[in-house]
């Protein structure tokens, strides 16, 4: 029993030792994990800081690139401007060179003229015979002229050139004043007058004059005829126009009625054939044709309003009385055609009433 108790105590002690060892190991593992995590966090922080620095550097580089691009654009613009200016300078230099050539040609011509003048002056000086006439504005010109003869020449030719040959400036900027002649003045004045006339009769001036005239005429119209009177005149004109249209329409209706009541061409043809066959039946055919034409005209004009019963009764009686008697030859008798005539009667109540009569030709 004692042995068992000691064994159990030893087991408990061993278990306690093992549990203490496992607890120490767990604590050490936790510490190592914490230290590792701290190191990882520090590494991550350093990485994030480096990434932020890299991003800032990238931004700085992008800004620098943009500034460089802007500078390049400015340089290109300035280069294009300088090229344009250089082209203008080249053109100006070409013009200046051409002008210089012209000036050189003029100077050469002047030199030729100067040499001619010098030769003439030398000839005159050799002859020593020339006249000098001086005109002044206020003082009248003398009648007699002074003539210099046998003038003593100076000893040196250089002194003579200085006295009689003043220095001539041959600069290209020198301007010469030439007096205009009377014809040139007249031409200028004529051109100025023509220009003034053209300006006076130009389109703009003519339009302005038209506008002013229209305004004046409108003012005069308003003074002469007031707007109320003008409106009344317009209304009266419209009324007259409407009455004229009504009259025209009534005339057209009257023409249509007359044309519809006129005898047709077929009636005339039948009448002419019957006249050729039987000249005695001329009167009957005339009445018959008139009746047929009036029937057609009455249909065009309008419906018949009233029929007289007495006339219808008389016609019926005549038709019943008149029988068809057989002829000797045994042939059936040919019935005579009915004669239809219309007699227009004008009444107070109905203006367009027509009277129908049916008569049998005997």
UniProtKB/Swiss-Prot annotation:
Where do the record's region annotations for Disordered lie?
1-24, 230-289, 305-346
Highest taxon of the lineage: Eukaryota
- Which terms are listed as keywords in the entry? Activator, Cell membrane, Coiled coil, Cytoplasm, Developmental protein, Differentiation, Membrane, Myogenesis, Phosphoprotein, Transcription, Transcription regulation
**In this UniProt entry, which cysteines form S-S bonds?**
none
One GO term of the biological process aspect: muscle organ development
Which GO molecular function annotations are given, in alphabetical order?
GTPase activator activity
Enumerate the subcellular locations listed in this protein's record, separating them with semicolons. Cytoplasm, Myofibril, Sarcomere; Cytoplasm; Cytoplasm, Cytosol; Membrane, Caveola
Q: What happens when the gene is disrupted?
A: Mice exhibit normal caveolar morphology and cardiac function under physiological conditions, whereas upon alpha-1 adrenergic receptor stimulation, show attenuation of cardiac hypertrophy accompanied by suppressed MAPK1/2 activation.
Which residues get modified to Phosphotyrosine?
A: 324
InterPro entries of this UniProt entry?
A: Cavin_fam
Q: Which residues carry this modification: Phosphothreonine?
A: 334
Give the induction text. Up-regulated in response to cardiac hypertrophy.
Q: Which residues, by range, are in coiled-coil regions?
A: 100-120
Q: Where is the composition biased (Basic and acidic residues)?
A: 230-255, 275-289, 305-320
Which tissues is it found in, per the record?
Answer: Abundantly expressed in cardiac and skeletal muscle (at protein level). Weaker expression in aorta and lung. In heart, expressed in cardiomyocytes and vascular smooth muscle cells but not in other surrounding cells including vascular endothelial cells.
Record remark: domains: The coiled coil domain (residues 44-77) is essential for membrane-targeting in cardiomyocytes.
Q: What does this protein do?
A: Modulates the morphology of formed caveolae in cardiomyocytes, but is not required for caveolar formation. Facilitates the recruitment of MAPK1/3 to caveolae within cardiomyocytes and regulates alpha-1 adrenergic receptor-induced hypertrophic responses in cardiomyocytes through MAPK1/3 activation. Contributes to proper membrane localization and stabilization of caveolin-3 (CAV3) in cardiomyocytes. Induces RHOA activation and activates NPPA transcription and myofibrillar organization through the Rho/ROCK signaling pathway.
- Provide the family line: Belongs to the CAVIN family.
Please report the name of this protein according to its UniProt entry: Caveolae-associated protein 4
Q: What is the lineage of its organism?
A: Eukaryota, Metazoa, Chordata, Craniata, Vertebrata
Gene that this sequence comes from = Cavin4
């Amino acid at each position: 029993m004692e042995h068992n108790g000691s064994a159990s105590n030893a087991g408990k002690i061993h278990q306690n030792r093992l549990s203490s060892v496992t607890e120490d190991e767990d604590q050490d593992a936790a510490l190592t994990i914490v230290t590792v995590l701290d190191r990882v966090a520090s590494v991550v922080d350093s990485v994030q800081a480096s990434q932020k620095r890299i991003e800032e550097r990238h931004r700085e580089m992008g800004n620098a690139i943009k500034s460089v691009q802007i500078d390049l654009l400015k340089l290109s613009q300035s280069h294009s401007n300088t090229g344009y200016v250089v082209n203008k300078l080249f053109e100006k230099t070409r013009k200046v060179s051409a002008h210089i050539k012209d000036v050189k040609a003029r100077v050469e011509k002047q030199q030729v003229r100067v040499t001619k003048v010098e030769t003439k002056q030398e000839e005159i000086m050799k002859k020593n015979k020339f006249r000098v006439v001086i005109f002044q504005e206020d003082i009248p010109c003398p009648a007699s002229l002074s003539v210099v003869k046998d003038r003593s020449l100076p000893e040196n030719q250089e002194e003579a050139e200085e006295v009689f040959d003043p220095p001539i400036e041959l600069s290209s900027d020198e301007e010469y004043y030439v007096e205009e002649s009377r014809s040139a003045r007249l031409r200028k004045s004529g051109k100025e007058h023509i220009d003034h006339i053209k300006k006076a009769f130009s389109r703009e001036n003519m339009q302005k004059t038209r506008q002013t005239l229209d305004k004046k005429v409108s003012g005069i119209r308003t003074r002469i005829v007031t707007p109320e009177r003008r409106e009344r005149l317009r209304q009266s004109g419209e009324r007259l126009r409407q009455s004229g249209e009504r009259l025209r329409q009534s005339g057209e209706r009257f023409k249509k009625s007359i044309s519809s009541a006129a005898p047709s061409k077929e009636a005339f043809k039948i009448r002419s054939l019957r006249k050729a066959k039987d000249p005695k039946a001329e009167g009957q055919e005339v009445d018959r044709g008139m009746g047929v034409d009036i029937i057609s005209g009455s249909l065009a004009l309008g419906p018949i309003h009233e029929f007289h019963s007495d006339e219808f009764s008389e016609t019926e009686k005549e038709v019943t009385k008149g029988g068809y008697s057989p002829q000797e030859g045994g042939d059936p008798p040919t019935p005579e055609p009915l004669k239809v005539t219309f007699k227009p009667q004008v009444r107070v109540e109905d203006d367009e009433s027509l009277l129908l009569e049916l008569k049998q030709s005997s």
